[in-house]
């Protein structure tokens, strides 16, 4: 669509840095786009709404929230020097651990639980009695394997891709938080691109969101089977 003007190179698994580093690299122009999720609540409190338990019911609900509050989130991002190009999803988060099944909040009592760096998530799990500790995603597998952490909470996609099922005994399907992922750019650097390039980028972001939602919904059953197959 861009007649060769746009070439996208993707880097996964924190190759270009952890969440906080990538936010800084965006502003410095060292990367063009990042895909942050929970860390956005540390950028502006408006994004903390997605850290509240059981706020988002399903993807259709998320679409309505985005339609109604999208301008609010964009303004919050731009006030900090960022621009939201589009929305993907991180997904509904579930708890895995090696201590016990989590059926009620009190089952979290004393569990050393890895969380993203989100003050709201930390508050939530502290109220539930857990011992939440922020930690970079790339460090979680080793922390679970060595017992530094008892458990963690993530969507199925992250659990399966990081192979947490290999070092965890229990999966509790809690769906306690739904976290979007934001296609994020530096406002200053994004605005420097020609109008025709921006039109293509924005169009692709919008059309890809629909694909991401469809794919995520389809993968939920498939990835849950992968996790269960490991004996969790």
Where are these regions (language model features)?
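N-terminal secretory/targeting leader peptides
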Residues: 1-61, 69-73, 77-232
């Amino acid at each position: 669509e861009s007649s060769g003007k746009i070439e996208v190179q993707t880097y996964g698994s924190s190759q270009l840095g952890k969440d906080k580093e990538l936010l800084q690299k965006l502003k410095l122009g060292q990367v063009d786009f990042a895909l942050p999720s929970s860390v956005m609540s540390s950028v502006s409190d408006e994004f903390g709404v997605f850290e509240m338990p059981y706020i988002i019911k399903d993807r259709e609900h998320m679409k309505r929230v985005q339609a109604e509050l999208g301008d609010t989130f964009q303004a919050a991002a731009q006030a900090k020097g960022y621009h939201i190009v589009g929305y993907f999803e991180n997904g509904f988060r579930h708890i895995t651990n090696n201590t016990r099944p989590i059926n009620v909040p009190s089952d979290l009592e004393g569990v050393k639980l890895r969380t993203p760096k989100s003050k709201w998530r930390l508050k939530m799990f502290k109220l539930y009695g857990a011992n939440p500790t922020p930690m970079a995603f790339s460090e979680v597998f080793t922390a679970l394997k060595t017992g530094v952490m008892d458990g963690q909470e993530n969507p199925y996609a992250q659990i399966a891709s990081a192979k947490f099922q290999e070092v965890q005994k229990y999966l509790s399907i809690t769906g306690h938080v739904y976290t979007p992922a934001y296609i994020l750019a530096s406002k200053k650097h994004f605005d420097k691109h020609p109008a025709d390039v921006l039109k293509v980028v924005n169009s692709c972001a919008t059309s890809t969101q629909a694909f991401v939602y469809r794919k995520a919904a389809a993968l939920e059953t498939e990835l849950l089977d992968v996790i269960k197959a490991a004996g969790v």
